A protein has these predicted regions:
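Catalytic loop of short-chain dehydrogenase/reductase
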Residues: 1-6, 10-14, 20-71
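Active-site loop/turn elements of alpha/beta-hydrolase fold enzymes
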Residues: 34-36, 82, 123
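Flexible, glycine-rich phosphate/dinucleotide-binding loops
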Residues: 40, 86, 127-129
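A short local structural element in Rossmann-fold oxidoreductases
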Residues: 43, 89-91
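Acidic/histidine-enriched, beta-strand-rich ligand/metal-binding domains
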Residues: 50, 80-81
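C-terminal helical subdomain
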Residues: 72, 79-80, 91-130
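Short, flexible catalytic-loop segment of classical short-chain dehydrogenase/reductase
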Residues: 82-88
Length: 130
């Protein structure tokens, strides 16, 4: 559990804290974290996967709070679920290919505005309830 929390929760926070100042000084001013819909408490309708789910719920909270801490830095902080992707983890029955996920995410990230900071989105840009 500890290793998963380090990877999925603590590492994104350390990366965000390390690069926030440089990102805010740059042209894009966007910091995006890839989470999972499995980290949504309101979307959770089944048991299992406790370690993964809790680590993604934790990174959602961490990045939501980080977005509040960086409001004065002109930095857009957003969280995305990449979709159910055909990968080793998602399996062959998943809904979309990695290419489809990335193409959609790139468009959504490009379209982010200051009004989106601190929000949680699906790969297609629709908001996800916490």
């Amino acid at each position: 559990w500890e290793q998963v929390l380090r990877t999925n929760t603590l590492s994104p926070l350390k990366i965000a804290a390390t690069f926030a100042k440089n990102l805010a000084a740059g042209r894009q001013k966007k910091l995006v974290t890839i989470s999972s819909i499995m980290g949504s408490i309101t979307q959770s309708d089944r048991g299992s996967d406790y370690i993964y789910r809790s680590s993604k719920a934790a990174v959602n909270m961490v990045m939501r709070n980080f977005s509040a801490d960086t409001l004065g830095r002109d930095l857009i902080v957003a969280i995305f679920h990449p979709g159910w992707v055909k990968t080793d983890m998602g399996g062959s029955g998943a809904a979309i290919t990695p290419s489809e996920s990335v193409t959609s995410l790139r468009k959504c990230i490009a379209d982010l505005t200051r009004a989106d900071t601190g929000k949680y989105f699906n790969f297609d840009g629709t908001p996800i309830d916490w």
